[in-house]
């Protein structure tokens, strides 16, 4: 039987670094909620059996009317960390018929520059891979190491072989769930899915990402994201 595709959007964060009381995924960019762009990109890919958005149990800001016409489901099962939210979402996917052998693409709600073309590039590159992988970009900037709380440069780090992880990150549901569970049991709170897969002893692959697909984090990022989203992505 052919493995199916599911998308999982952890959306339980408060966006404390964004400088706004409103969680960043609900802020308006170029006329739409930031989250809308992610949902629209996955909605445009008919290959997906379901897209699941995981929000906090006490989220008072989510309004389904802002995303009318898009195909997705919502579950209020967000946890105290991204890792916990993803784990809870993976468990919820069984409700939609997902099996351990199916693929899940986990994507940050705060990366509105994702495109259907990039999603399909990732799927095409990894659909026959035994592990899976992520979209990422080679590090372009020179890297400096500075001690915590300080401002003096200790040394310059080599950027050779370094890639900046993005999302989506694509893995088999069973493998990812087991990897996160193992990390949790060992007291590790990892910041992305690939880290959990690596922790479990597997080797994910990288697929070339896009500068457009950056993560909106700080207040100044909103202006940049709005400028990008105001112009349609070029077809690849």
Swiss-Prot record:
Organism for this UniProt entry: Burkholderia thailandensis (strain ATCC 700388 / DSM 13276 / CCUG 48851 / CIP 106301 / E264)
GO biological process, one term: isopentenyl diphosphate biosynthetic process, methylerythritol 4-phosphate pathway
Superkingdom of this protein's organism: Bacteria
CDD domains assigned: CDP-ME_synthetase (cd02516)
PROSITE patterns recorded: ISPD (PS01295)
Protein's job: Catalyzes the formation of 4-diphosphocytidyl-2-C-methyl-D-erythritol from CTP and 2-C-methyl-D-erythritol 4-phosphate (MEP).
The protein's annotated pathway: Isoprenoid biosynthesis; isopentenyl diphosphate biosynthesis via DXP pathway; isopentenyl diphosphate from 1-deoxy-D-xylulose 5-phosphate: step 2/6
UniProt keywords, alphabetically: Isoprene biosynthesis, Nucleotidyltransferase, Transferase
This protein's name: 2-C-methyl-D-erythritol 4-phosphate cytidylyltransferase
Enzymatic reactions: 2-C-methyl-D-erythritol 4-phosphate + CTP + H(+) = 4-CDP-2-C-methyl-D-erythritol + diphosphate
One of the Pfam families matching this protein, by short name: IspD
Keyword Transmembrane helix applies: no
Example GO molecular function: 2-C-methyl-D-erythritol 4-phosphate cytidylyltransferase activity
EC nos: 2.7.7.60
Site description Transition state stabilizer, residues in chain: 17, 24
Site description Positions MEP for the nucleophilic attack, residues in chain: 159, 215
Matches recorded under InterPro entries: IspD, IspD/TarI, IspD/TarI_cytidylyltransf_bact, ISPD_synthase_CS, Nucleotide-diphossugar_trans
Family from the record: Belongs to the IspD/TarI cytidylyltransferase family. IspD subfamily.
């Amino acid at each position: 039987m052919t493995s199916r595709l599911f998308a999982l959007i952890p959306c339980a964060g408060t966006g404390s670094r964004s400088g706004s009381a409103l969680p960043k995924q609900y802020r308006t960019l170029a006329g739409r909620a930031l989250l809308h762009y992610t949902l629209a990109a996955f909605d445009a890919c008919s290959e997906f059996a379901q897209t699941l958005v995981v929000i906090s149990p006490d989220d008072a800001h989510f309004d389904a009317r802002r995303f009318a016409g898009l195909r997705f489901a919502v579950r209020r099962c967000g946890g105290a960390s991204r890792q916990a939210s993803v784990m809870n979402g993976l468990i919820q996917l069984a409700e939609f018929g997902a099996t351990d052998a199916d693929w899940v693409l986990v994507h940050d709600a705060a990366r509105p520059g994702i495109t259907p073309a990039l999603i399909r590039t990732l799927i095409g590159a990894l659909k026959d891979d035994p592990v899976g992988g992520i979209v990422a970009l080679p590090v372009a900037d020179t890297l400096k190491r500075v001690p915590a709380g300080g401002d003096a440069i200790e040394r310059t780090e080599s950027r050779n072989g370094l890639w900046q992880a993005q999302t989506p990150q694509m893995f088999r549901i069973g493998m990812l769930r087991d990897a996160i569970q193992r990390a949790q049991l060992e007291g590790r709170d990892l910041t992305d899915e690939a880290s959990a897969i690596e922790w479990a002893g597997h080797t994910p692959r990288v697929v070339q990402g896009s500068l457009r697909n950056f993560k909106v984090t700080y207040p100044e990022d909103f202006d940049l994201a709005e400028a990008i989203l105001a112009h349609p992505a070029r077809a690849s």
